[in-house]
């Protein structure tokens, strides 16, 4: 696999090694051994995934920007197995030199790219195709009482969602998240969330 570091430390784009022939293709979508040997040294710590999730959404659906508060913080490894999405990670760690900055990557059924989002980031995506099936691995279980978010429509984040926001389809919960300027982050750059 090819590991691409982004402008924000710890946020990684992962391109799997694809084997194609007349029958189709094959690739390892996840190998704990390879993740530990190749990615953990870049991150400076191990990540152990314990839950896999899948969602199906239609064009214009926007989900996010979500996170889980301590002590139930989550890292995520995400990919799109059908269709096309724009996936985004926003740094919400107080004191971080990249606080409020984001990384956006297009994930498609054809490019097979995966996106690693560390703890201390808000995560969201929008669907660019007619439908999309989205899968993600988490290193902590879902805890609804720790659910949090910031507004996916916050213009100050500078995210180009590609689709016009008037076509956005959001859950009621996601329409109620605070803008970044009104948000009191539970994360701090000086607190190691992996200990």
Residue ranges and their predicted role:
Residues 1-110, 131, 138-195:
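Non-catalytic, conserved peripheral segments adjacent to functional cores
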Residues 107-131:
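Conserved metal-binding segment of the jelly-roll/cupin
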């Amino acid at each position: 696999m090819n590991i691409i570091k982004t402008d924000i430390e710890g946020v990684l784009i992962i391109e799997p090694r694809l084997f194609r022939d007349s029958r189709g293709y094959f690739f390892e979508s996840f190998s704990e051994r390879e993740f530990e040997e190749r990615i953990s040294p870049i991150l400076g710590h191990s990540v152990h995934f314990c839950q896999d999730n899948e969602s199906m959404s239609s064009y214009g659906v926007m989900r996010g920007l979500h996170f889980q508060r301590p002590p139930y913080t989550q890292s995520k490894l995400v990919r799109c197995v059908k269709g096309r999405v724009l996936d985004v990670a926003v740094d919400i760690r107080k004191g971080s030199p990249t606080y409020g900055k984001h990384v956006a990557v297009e994930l498609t059924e054809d490019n097979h790219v995966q996106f690693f989002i560390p703890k201390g980031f808000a995560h969201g995506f929008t669907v660019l195709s007619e439908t999309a099936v989205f899968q993600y691995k988490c290193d902590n279980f879902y805890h609804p009482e720790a659910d949090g978010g910031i507004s996916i429509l916050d213009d100050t984040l500078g995210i180009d969602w590609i689709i016009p926001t008037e076509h956005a389809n959001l859950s009621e919960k996601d329409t109620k998240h605070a803008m970044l300027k009104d948000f009191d982050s539970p994360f701090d750059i000086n607190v190691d969330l992996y200990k």
